[in-house]
Amino acid sequence: MRGEIMKEKCGIFGAYSQDATKKTYYGLMALQHRGQEGAGISVWDGDIRTVKGHGLVSEVFKGGSIRRLNGNPVIGHVRYSTSGSLSEVQPLEVECCGYKVSIAHNGTLTNFLPLRRFYESRGFKFRSSIDTEVIAVSFLNHYSELKDEFEAMSRVFEEVKGAYSVLMLFNGKLIAVRDPVGFRPLSFGAGDGYYFSSEDSALRMFCTNIRDVSPGEVIVVKDGEAESKIVGRSEHAYCVFEYIYFARPDSIINGISVYWARYRMGVELARESPAEGDVVIAVPDSGRTAALGFAHESGIPYMEGLIKNRYIGRTFIMPSGREIKVRLKLSPVKEVIKGRRIVLVDDSIVRGTTMKNIVKMLRDAGAREVHVRIASPPIRYPCYMGIDIPTRHELIAAWKSIEEIKKEIGADSLAYLSVEGLKRAIGTDKLCMACLTGNYPEWAFDFKV
């Protein structure tokens, strides 16, 4: 839920086409949900030029700055983190071994520090503190020896562990890379040019021939042609929270509709943990699709009982109190809630503080009962692959039972979707569910350096 929020690291977009800069700008706008705190675009015009800054895409590229970036190919990035200097906003320009690259990265490296120390011991100088630079240095180091993008990336896959979908501008070429496990999504589209995006929903305005970049695949676009090779292999483990929460509902990731996966989560939840209620409502927007599935399966009518204030922007100065924050963002429809038994559906509970205040809000609006249903299993473990999940002691499910959480949030009943129910809803078991189970994919921690 977006109140106590888990945050995705970023979104990336790339274009090799006419008007590539403008299309990349539009693509980043379509990926704005993946990061609201920073944005940037790099273009190739015989050299690499980059404009980036803190804020939304529309804020960074206001005043005509986008018109000064003419080139092809182009890559762009949206970022969530508020920490770090402007030099750490992506795309990141990196020079070493006599070469220069601009790189945009979605994910997190699990062996960032040992790999950085390894390269520092060999005389490489790092200009930022982010793991993205390590990927670029590894690539340029191996390319300087092998003089082939595919062979260089094969070495990178052996060396760099963790989650990374990457776009790079290199010598007039556009290079797309997805790690061998496929943690983070990456889509590839062809039409009047070639396009890449963290989600296919951002590609549909430009092309209809769209597919996933396969785990371990490298695509090099140069001279108007795209060449592809699978150069890294491992057991696939797609991030489960792309389906639960992060991706847009209209996206298709790894061949699976995000909308229907969430809808089926609600269906499975209703089968596993039915509730006696008069109306099903969702925590907007994160719980809506699952709530529709729950309502359909249970036969309990769905209604809009909470209205989201969409005009509190990123720069709004929020008050310090948690309850007033929730009430500024959400408002109950008393005519829907008063005197009724409410089944409240959301995608997840992280710390529990936001849900506690929503339950109180519903009771204040006259709800007879509040039954909370969560369309994912309890989050008990941190993520090391690019999702900003709080430390384990901040995760309420890591140290409290479901009965204790129910009492903490003030609900009449509480139930979560099971791990098996989640797998059935998504339709695959090729998932990274480490934050739910504590079982981390081996490849991501098999350090070679």
Swiss-Prot record:
Q: Which reaction does it catalyse?
A: 5-phospho-beta-D-ribosylamine + L-glutamate + diphosphate = 5-phospho-alpha-D-ribose 1-diphosphate + L-glutamine + H2O
- Show where the Glutamine amidotransferase type-2 domain sits: 10-224
Q: Which UniProt keywords apply?
A: 4Fe-4S, Glutamine amidotransferase, Glycosyltransferase, Iron, Iron-sulfur, Magnesium, Metal-binding, Purine biosynthesis, Transferase
Q: What is this protein called?
A: Amidophosphoribosyltransferase
- Domain of life of the organism encoding this protein: Archaea
Which cofactors does it use? Mg(2+); [4Fe-4S] cluster
The answer on whether this UniProt entry bears the keyword Zinc reads no
Residue numbers annotated as active site? C10 (nucleophile)
InterPro entries registered for this protein in UniProt: GATase_2_dom, Ntn_hydrolases_N, PRibTrfase_dom, PRTase-like, PurF, PurF_N
Q: What GO terms describe the biological role, i.e. biological process, of this protein?
A: 'de novo' IMP biosynthetic process; purine nucleobase biosynthetic process
What EC number(s) does this enzyme carry?
2.4.2.14
Which residues participate in [4Fe-4S] cluster binding?
C239, C383, C432, C435
Assigned protein family: In the C-terminal section; belongs to the purine/pyrimidine phosphoribosyltransferase family.
Q: Which GO terms describe its molecular function?
A: 4 iron, 4 sulfur cluster binding; amidophosphoribosyltransferase activity; magnesium ion binding
The cross-references to SUPFAM superfamilies, in alphabetical order and at most eight, read: N-terminal nucleophile aminohydrolases (Ntn hydrolases), PRTase-like
Keyword Iron among UniProt keywords: yes
User: What does this protein's record comment on cofactor binding?
Assistant: Binds 1 Mg(2+) ion per subunit. Binds 1 [4Fe-4S] cluster per subunit.
Pathway(s) this gene product operates in, as recorded in its UniProt entry: Purine metabolism; IMP biosynthesis via de novo pathway; N(1)-(5-phospho-D-ribosyl)glycinamide from 5-phospho-alpha-D-ribose 1-diphosphate: step 1/2
Which ranges of residues are annotated as propeptide in this record? Answer: 1-9
Purpose of the protein: Catalyzes the formation of phosphoribosylamine from phosphoribosylpyrophosphate (PRPP) and glutamine.
Binding locations of Mg(2+): S286, D346, D347
